[in-house]
């Protein structure tokens, strides 16, 4: 079975990290997001993946130099201009020569969804397309999906106000689609699957949804990226995948709590790191405090950062204090 994986976004919420590294290639517990996603798809029966690319395609080619991810064959569809979700799906599916039933997945979603179960539900229902749903605590922050007892989608409610809907289920970013849906997604112009294609399918009664309680997180924001790293690191059993990588250099007097630390990281004496992700290249000076942050650059001695992102060329000067800062501030040329 084929899958289209949407990875063409700019990753604006994770800048300045994503000026250098496309968001789906950022590691989650030491493994690039895209590899974790493709491995999950493979467990559900996917044999071929086409990446719908736009921004910075070259790093993806480098990540898969033999065009394989495990046993999954990788191909690429590079947009010359952004096509939005449905446009990208139509373009990539045609580029890969997809026929029959196929999967669509968002490249920045981490989930334990059993894709084979979603496909089985899709086939039982006779749907043209099926979307996975996940329960959310605050429906006002999501596009909420209402279904009937059989799972047929009745309507979408975008960021509902209190009392506007009883549903608490949001689209989880994984879809099963029939080849016939490509007629609604020509792939030649910008087109939104959420605002155009799905409503068309709802109108004809051909869109279904399956809700699960599987682990799910959109790792595309700073807070959720940190949370995804922590969540997945705690699920792993291999010492090489421990939250603090065995090859990281951590001073004996440093304190590291609820953080994920990559291999090529140095943490100095009396430094404190909590609720953060330190990526390859990060340097934390003596006495520095790092909280709720993502660091790939340098944090000087006795500096204190909270809710910050330090890119690969970012430098937090010794003694500097920052909340919500981005280092460097401007675009990296």
Task: Describe the residue ranges of each PLM region.
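Catalytic-core segments of class I nucleotidyltransferases/pyrophosphorylases
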Residues: 102-103, 110, 116-123, 136-139, ...
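Histidine-centered beta-alpha loop that forms part of the nucleotide-sugar donor binding/catalytic region
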Residues: 8, 54, 107, 134-135, ...
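Short internal beta-strands
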Residues: 50-54, 132-133, 294
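Conserved beta-loop-beta/alpha segment of the NTase-like Rossmann-fold superfamily
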Residues: 60-149
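Structural signal for interior beta-strand "rungs" in well-ordered beta-sheet cores
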Residues: 242-333
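N-terminal glycine-rich phosphate-binding loop and ensuing alpha1 helix
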Residues: 1-61, 312
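A structural signal for short hydrophobic beta-strand segments in well-ordered beta-sheet cores
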Residues: 25, 145-147, 198, 209
């Amino acid at each position: 079975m084929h899958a289209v994986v949407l990875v063409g976004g700019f990753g604006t919420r994770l800048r300045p990290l994503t000026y250098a590294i496309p968001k789906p290639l950022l590691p989650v517990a030491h493994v690039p997001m895209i590899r974790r996603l493709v491995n999950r798809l493979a467990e559900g029966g996917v044999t071929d993946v086409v990446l719908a690319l736009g921004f910075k395609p070259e790093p993806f080619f480098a990540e898969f130099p033999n065009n394989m991810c495990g046993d999954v064959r990788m191909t690429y569809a590079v947009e010359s201009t952004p096509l939005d979700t449905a446009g990208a799906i139509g373009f990539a599916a045609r580029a890969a020569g997809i026929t029959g039933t196929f999967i669509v997945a968002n490249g920045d979603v981490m989930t334990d969804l059993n894709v084979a179960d979603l496909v089985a539900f899709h086939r039982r229902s006779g749907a043209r397309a099926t979307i996975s749903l996940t329960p959310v605590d605050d429906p006002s922050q999501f596009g909420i999906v209402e279904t009937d007892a059989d799972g047929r989608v009745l309507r979408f409610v975008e960021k509902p106000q209190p009392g506007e809907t009883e549903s608490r289920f949001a689209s989880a970013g994984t879809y099963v689609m029939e080849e016939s849906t490509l007629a609604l997604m020509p792939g030649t112009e910008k087109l939104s699957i959420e605002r155009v294609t799905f409503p068309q399918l709802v109108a004809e009664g051909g869109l279904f949804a399956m809700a699960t309680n599987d682990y799910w997180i959109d790792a595309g924001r700073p807070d959720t990226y940190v949370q995804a790293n922590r969540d997945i690191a705690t699920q792993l059993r291999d010492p090489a995948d421990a939250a603090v990588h065995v090859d990281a250099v951590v001073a004996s007097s440093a304190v590291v709590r609820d953080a994920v630390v990559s291999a090529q990281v140095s943490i100095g004496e009396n430094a404190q790191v909590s609720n953060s992700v330190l990526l390859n290249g990060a340097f934390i000076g003596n006495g520095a405090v790092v909280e709720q942050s993502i660091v790939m650059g340098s944090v000087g001695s006795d500096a204190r950062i909270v809710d910050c992102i330090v890119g690969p060329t970012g430098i937090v000067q010794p003694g500097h204090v920052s909340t919500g800062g981005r280092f460097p501030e401007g675009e990296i040329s």
